[in-house]
Amino acid sequence: ILANAKTISIGSTGFTKGVLNFINFTQTGSTAQSLLLTGSSQTVIGPATSFGGALTLSSPGVQLNGATFSGTTNITKTGTSNDDGRGGNTFHGISTIINNGTGYLKLGNNNPDVFNADVQFSTTSTGNFYVADNSAGNQFNGNTTFNNTGTGTDVRMMIAENTNATSTFNGDVTINNSGSID
């Protein structure tokens, strides 16, 4: 448990390899958290995890495996790994999730995700982005924006790609594609 008004910080030498796990982790209060990981490191959030405040995370690898995000959430994947998030996440605040890496990023691979406010998904490099990938019952309760500005060939933004996947959009959906697609 992270007490109210406390923060998590990366030390002066950085976090360049290995895995930063937030499993059975609870942040009480609404203090904003900001984490920057580099190199070949990964961040795994969940299961049984909750962030009470805003979260800004930039990490080479990202797996979202069952967490509740109460504040504004900004997550950017920057690395080469292929990351399969199990899903089971609930986002209560406005959220932005970006794949700026060369490996793919999957959300909702086993369990549905719920977005209770506006959400924006973007792929900005050569890695594909799979949203609501392989789970039934994904919910998008605010406005949803999908951006593909990826570079390279065959860069894809995929929504509910697999046969098991279902999604309900209760707000407007905007799709922007200015990337390179074959």
Q: Would you name each region that the model predicts?
A:
Residues 1-90, 94-114, 118-139, 143-168, ...:
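Extracellular beta-strand-rich, repetitive "passenger/adhesive" scaffolds
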